[in-house]
From Swiss-Prot:
It comes from the Eukaryota. GO terms for molecular function: aspartic-type endopeptidase activity. Residues 504-540 are cytoplasmic. Gene3D superfamilies: Acid Proteases (2.40.70.10). Residues 1-31 form the signal peptide. It is found in: Membrane. Belongs to the peptidase A1 family. Keywords: Aspartyl protease, Disulfide bond, Hydrolase, Membrane, Protease, Signal, Transmembrane, Transmembrane helix, Zymogen. This is Beta-secretase. GO terms for cellular component: endosome; plasma membrane; trans-Golgi network. Disulfide bonds join C222-C439, C291-C469, C345-C397. Residues 81-435 form the Peptidase A1 domain. It comes from Strongylocentrotus purpuratus (Purple sea urchin).
Amino acid sequence: MHFSLPTSRIVVVVPAAAICIVCVLIETCTAARSHVYTIPLRKGKETSFAETVGEPVRTNQVNVSVEEQKNNIRGRPGLGYYIEVDIGTPPQKLNVLIDTGSSNFAVAASSHNAISTYYRRNESSTYEDQGTYVKVPYTQGEWSGDLGQDLVQIASLGNQSFQANIAAITESKMFFLNDSRWQGILGLGYAEIARPDSSVEPFFDSLTSQTSIQDIFALQMCGALASTNDTNLGSSADGPVEEVIGSMNIGGLDASLYHGTMQYAPLRDEWFYEVIMTDIRVGNDSLGLDCKEYNFDKTIVDSGTTNLRLPVRVFEAITNAIKAHTTKHMPDVPSEFWTGMNLMCPTDSTSPYEPYHWFPTLTLDLQSTNQGQAFSLVVSPQQYLRRDYDHEDKKNCFKFAIAPSTNHAGAVIGAVIMEGFYVVFDRENKRVGFARSTCPGACEKTGTCVGNSPLITEAFNIDFDASDCGYDRSTSYDPALTITAYVLAAICLVCLIPVIVFALTHQINKRCKGRRGRGVVNHHRLDQEGLAENEPNSDP
């Protein structure tokens, strides 16, 4: 599942040719530098983060402690985590996918064979149609519908409602998933990536602007690490599937949901939750790539994407390194396993958990908010080897949860990585926090833990500027913009040709007239001189 938006930041480069038409109108065409236009960002308030830990969530109507927001999200392996919301008057209960990789709040508004219920806007007395069509394509799937507004309540926040923008989905393709149990998507990103444009206020912005809830939320997703069920793993239309749980804390943190110290990565920009990755290690060995490659063209934290996705070159490097660690113990792993096209199923003679022992830990180093430092997320094999069930052969199998990014989508720290940690989206202070999760560890019960992973290290010094690892999107190449530039250049050339012809004609005519004038004068002088020579000499 991959529901983050596929687009990079929109950066429009207007070459000098594009302004030539204006130059013609003012009779002068001058060579000009290219100009870069970006959408300005909205800056949040600077507040003390410590005040939010364990504090009651203050709203217009009720006080809700973050400790009361435990186990309020559910999910299915590979199908995402969802939270219950009430929409409209009278309230209609729906489950919505929690997605930090997009910014639209959208729910099904018509029947679909993959969902059991949908939003009936005509039955809500508080629904307001905005008269705007919206379409959102994802890397996987898309939906379209009508933009409107209605009252929304989050069940775990108590009797608290606010007005939110809602897209009523009327058409979709590869979006709703069988057995997922959710009927919509809750985009928690920033306004800059909202569709159809940034004027659509996102859900969390509406929540914090209409209440006194602080601009922060946290996710604890207890998926792979808490899973102990040996059968019916993953999704299937053939029968019941395993359900996983978690917590979404809105307005503060619950200190009982994490161990140790929280480490923070600064938000590079406010669109996706973009951070900077400084290195990747397999076991104890660095991939040794230029750090810019890890972040081409961005690195985001996205709960709506299942896998760890990496730029193609990085994916190839990490896959080769993992293969080198596992080949000695597991030489028969099918090649299609590494591309996600096939499952790896242990033989009858091996423990269903044995592969965890032969696969290495992964370490993702992230830029720290401490100047000149980074910190590490140590990822267990139990996170990136997703358990699945082969219903045909009745076997417990594994799926490789690392995949290459498509269409320059960059690196995506998806759900399989987030499931090992308590992840804080501190929008007020423009940072993302990570701490070790208190989710019950299934590996401890089954004896499949590898080292102490997953874990998070203290911040450590680095001898380079981590900001230099970020990808410079101002140089991004956009074929559509390039074609537009060429078209404008052609129009400019067509407009300039008459001007050039006119200028040349004018200069030629001017010179010709000058030459004719000088020719008459010179001829007259010659005639006068000739007459003087022919006159008789009057001197004696």
